[in-house]
Amino acid sequence: MAMTEQQKFKVLADQIKISNQLDAEILNSGELTRIDVSNKNRTWEFHITLPQFLAHEDYLLFIHAIEQEFKDIANVTCRFTVTNGTNQDEHAIKYFGHCIDQTALSPKVKGQLKQKKLIMSGKVLKVMVSNDIERNHFDKACNGSLIKAFRNCGFDIDKIIFETNDNDQEQNLASLEAHIQEEDEQSARLATEKLEKMKAEKAKQQDNNESAVDKCQIGKPIQIENIKPIESIIEEEFKVAIEGVIFDINLKELKSGRHIVEIKVTDYTDSLVLKMFTRKNKDDLEHFKALSVGKWVRAQGRIEEDTFIRDLVMMMSDIEEIKKATKKDKAEEKRVEFHLHTAMSQMDGIPNIGAYVKQAADWGHPAIAVTDHNVVQAFPDAHAAAEKHGIKMIYGMEGMLVDDGAPIAYKPQDVVLKDATYVVFDVETTGLSNQYNKIIELAAVKVHNGEIIDKFERFSNPHERLSETIINLTHITDDMLVDAPEIEEVLTEFKEWVGDAIFVAHNASFDMGFIDTGYERLGFGPSTNGVIDTLELSRTINTEYGKHGLNFLAKKYGVELTQHHRAIYDTEATAYIFIKMVQQMKELGVLNHNEINKKLSNQDAYKRARPSHVTLIVQNQQGLKNLFKIVSASLVKYFYRTPRIPRSLLDEYREGLLVGTACDEGELFTAVMQKDQSQVEKIAKYYDFIEIQPPALYQDLIDRELIRDTETLHEIYQRLIHAGDTAGIPVIATGNAHYLFEHDGIARKILIASQPGNPLNRSTLPEAHFRTTDEMLNEFHFLGEEKAHEIVVKNTNELADRIERVVPIKDELYTPRMEGANEEIRELSYANARKLYGEDLPQIVIDRLEKELKSIIGNGFAVIYLISQRLVKKSLDDGYLVGSRGSVGSSFVATMTEITEVNPLPPHYICPNCKTSEFFNDGSVGSGFDLPDKTCETCGAPLIKEGQDIPFETFLGFKGDKVPDIDLNFSGEYQPNAHNYTKVLFGEDKVFRAGTIGTVAEKTAFGYVKGYLNDQGIHKRGAEIDRLVKGCTGVKRTTGQHPGGIIVVPDYMDIYDFTPIQYPADDQNSAWMTTHFDFHSIHDNVLKLDILGHDDPTMIRMLQDLSGIDPKTIPVDDKEVMQIFSTPESLGVTEDEILCKTGTFGVPEFGTGFVRQMLEDTKPTTFSELVQISGLSHGTDVWLGNAQELIKTGICDLSSVIGCRDDIMVYLMYAGLEPSMAFKIMESVRKGKGLTEEMIETMKENEVPDWYLDSCLKIKYMFPKAHAAAYVLMAVRIAYFKVHHPLYYYASYFTIRASDFDLITMIKDKTSIRNTVKDMYSRYMDLGKKEKDVLTVLEIMNEMAHRGYRMQPISLEKSQAFEFIIEGDTLIPPFISVPGLGENVAKRIVEARDDGPFLSKEDLNKKAGLSQKIIEYLDELGSLPNLPDKAQLSIFDM
């Protein structure tokens, strides 16, 4: 009889020998309900029902006993059910520790969790934790597993809640971080003795080592056999080990003072984020600091879902830096790469040249070439990298070679076109190569006197199966060819049928290639008949067409074309098109076949030719200059869809260049496919070396059926090698590399996929990584070991030896020459100084002039000053002020030559009449403009106040030998005039815009990556997406121009001595050409003028035009003007009305929210304090956390904190430091390098206060005082108009500086406008950029309205195209202010209005071209009162 479940339980208790330990009730009432057995997993699960909870001690004894009894048979678990759960809450507290042990938490965290307070309420268990972070972590990490553990023990629990005690949060935060991340001490005790010994020895070694950690090792060593690929991590796991290379690392300090590190690694199967908190009393931070991008690490930890980034991450317990075996070039004799593409190959190459050069050097290659597509923009960086790594750099380019004009007529015949007989024919073939493919259909029609008089149509049997591609293209099937005659029979019959007629074909070179090859194989020799190519003929006589395919031409000529790509139909269509073309030629005066090429040739013939790739290698310095000329001509003169190099251009500048055959797109490779060997060898003689590239790179040609198979490809290689051997030309193996390693190829795929029109999208991209010598030898093993070594190693090294050392970048500055520049600058400086200070110059003036002139003239900089002076003078003469930028205002010579308005001398008075002066040299006055008003004691005239106290050293350095960088702010509307004036000064061929290179930005790359993954149906975690984004970032995307930079070439050199030239973004309609090199590359070699466009001078000019006030006469210390920087009272409004505590809305430099807050904090009242504000706002770590705190705590006031870089030198010299040391300190601090021990000691010796030293140590970047002073001077002048001439100011502001308008709000009353502004403030964080720009305009409008002025609606009768105009106390906005209305339409409205009034909305749409949407907006604005939808017809109009 079967045992009951109670009996089973008793048997079990006896078997595991605990019967005597159990309570009698439990022993008698307990039930063993079932046992779940898994033989596969060797697990037994006992299901036991008890009448009550076992005492915790008994429970542990039971579990231990049952595990021991069956340990050799299975892994045992128990699942209890308790029928009477009385006192469940008490038992839960006792069982808590055991249940925690069943979770996946680390032992250390388990220990901490066991100390938490437990509260049981019904079926809910509450665990009291210290803070929100702890609560979130425990809830996520163990909630489910903890509930399961309690239920397995018999507890009836629905959920567990982790609750925080708010009072404990702050004090326990640091403890929490440790709990989550620290190593488990208990686990360490259970480790093997050997491991303990290793750790002890390592600890001892670290204790004895006082130097910084140079290799990361945290936690336990990780067993390599546990490593798994990152791509296999797809869900949360307790313990995982991985290896990867770091591609991003971020170390963040927490409020507790500890740090968290976030590392992104990849093993190139996938990527993962690793995280870890530093442990207390450990040197983890130093270990993390030893890590950097590019290092390999082995890491171990828990995989969990990060709720913030919503992705899997590893919370590390262990990490160690490892040495990963890198790719080696093990060949004894290394090769040289002659074909390589960098990130400058537009949207095609991946790494920068520096990465290639470093890798080549690491492999021991003696040299390396760079051959980007159509450009040489990598040359400067290539030179620097080669010098750094000690490797020979070979400079080159892969260009597009075209014949100067593809002929229309071949083998000219003396035949009158109207009398000739033509055979218009077409062939269908098994492929594109007449050498390796066969004709399957030959069709022709015979034409005479404009009519088709005969037809010829034959199939031929190729004796091979047609590919699916050919069947789909031609609609010819194998069945149609089975019984077809041999091609020999077809061609023999065809030749006889043709007679002496002129051949006509569309793309005749293709069709005639097959005919001539067939004739020659039959022993006929090539055809002697004349030929006309209708494709080239159309390109010449139909230049207005963008396409010239047969389909397109058939439509244009009205010819029916059915079943395109069947020979007979194509032939008939071509015949009818050609008949019409003959008439066109007659109208152009072309009457004879032998006149076609002569009379129809044109200068744009290069556009018609099909480009072939060609490699150009620089052999010497002359070759470099010639290459620069070729590149320039291809980009400027011969650009058509892509830069083109006419063969005649290459021939003209071939000296110093080695010409190679390039890739499968090269002329020679094409010839092997299309011509017999004698023709191939003839073409080969044009080149200096023949390239053959790895078969792997040509696999796509086989896939696309352009090459039949690998055997055919090998035959092509043999023919290329034979051509080289026959012509005595070296054959070299080149890699055509587009990236460094195989795993980088994905980035190129992504970039190519982002270009829908790129032909490379048609096929699978081959592996184009940078190959080692061994890899290249292996690629060409089919040639035999000796021949492979010859082309891979021997020939590449010999070719490299023929190339001289070439330097692409000059090593010194070449400035223009201007006769008498030294004398003119000296005379001009002294003349203006005497005009201002009198004939008897003060000694301080003489000393400063002489000091500066000695440096300026002695170092050859006078010409730079003179150029700047003439540019500024021209602008001033034309009525536009010029603002200076940068440190030029530090130069008193620049002031005296009127380059800048900033006077850098110490603050001083000057009498305009008797020239008496008084200088303040003790630092007591920050700016001369802040001196109190004073009259001359001699003559009683009001004294002029000047001087900003700026040392000259901040401009040209302490020795005065730094090349001056004079940046000038011209009016934006005058800037083109200033640019063009440089052509007057130097000549059109001596000035160019400074070129820039636009690369793929991170945000753009992210779009490319996401698009590619979506298209491919691939899901990747965020870390892998980040890696792919980094791979695509930095690749050249376009070119551009510096907004104001003009490069000046000296008259004794030409531009090609420095750089090629081009149009920005290849825009052939651009008014200026730019440098081909990024201007930074040649910054130290040629003079760069920064002629920038700025709104301030434009606004000043408009204010001057409106008011008639000369801006130079505006007082800089006007009290009401100064007041607006701390209160809006002088504007006649309150803070509440304009919602701002200052009156600086719209004042340059002081109108942004950030600077307005600075003004509220500091309440400046003087010009020097405004200069301080400008310096503080532009610096990095100068205000926030630095000067701001010093002012708030009362340690300093605004005038004494460090604001501009020059303040440091001036302050320290006044404190007693030597000028040279003061200068060194200033330079160190402004560059964010802090202070050396020597500097600190010197400053303390001169009693510089500690707060000053601390402030210096925090600064990362500082603004020049001269720049700040120039900005503030403009700002104060504009503010003057705002205070004293409001409508002039508002009209100018809205016209010049504003761009986004909400006119519907702007025409409302002041209360409505204020409410709108207030509402937008409340939603500020949710506003987009455009809305924020609108808000800026509405802030100004609100202020204007509360000052008693208002905005009218747009007026069809009065509004201008672009300018706000004043009418009474109102402004009338221009048409351009209407959202969505462009410049051209704005002008068109005004022009149409001048022709007469608009009669209706329909009339407005018709005359001005306004869209319905714009008309509706104007209607809503109230700008179209009484204007009907349509004009009413009057009797007088009839």
Curated annotation (Swiss-Prot):
Coiled coil: none annotated. SMART domains: EXOIII (SM00479), POLIIIAc (SM00481). It is found in: Cytoplasm. GO terms for cellular component: cytoplasm. Pfam families: DNA_pol3_a_NI, DNA_pol3_a_NII, DNA_pol3_alpha, DNA_pol3_finger, HHH_6, PHP, RNase_T. GO terms for molecular function: 3'-5' exonuclease activity; DNA binding; DNA-directed DNA polymerase activity. It is an enzyme of class 2 (transferase). Residues 422-578 form the Exonuclease domain. The keyword Hydrolase applies. Its EC number is 2.7.7.7. Keywords: Cytoplasm, DNA replication, DNA-directed DNA polymerase, Exonuclease, Hydrolase, Nuclease, Nucleotidyltransferase, Transferase. The keyword Nucleotidyltransferase applies. GO terms for biological process: DNA-templated DNA replication. Its main location: cytoplasm. It comes from the Bacteria. It catalyses: DNA(n) + a 2'-deoxyribonucleoside 5'-triphosphate = DNA(n+1) + diphosphate. Belongs to the DNA polymerase type-C family. PolC subfamily. Required for replicative DNA synthesis. This DNA polymerase also exhibits 3' to 5' exonuclease activity. HAMAP family: DNApol_PolC. This is DNA polymerase III PolC-type.
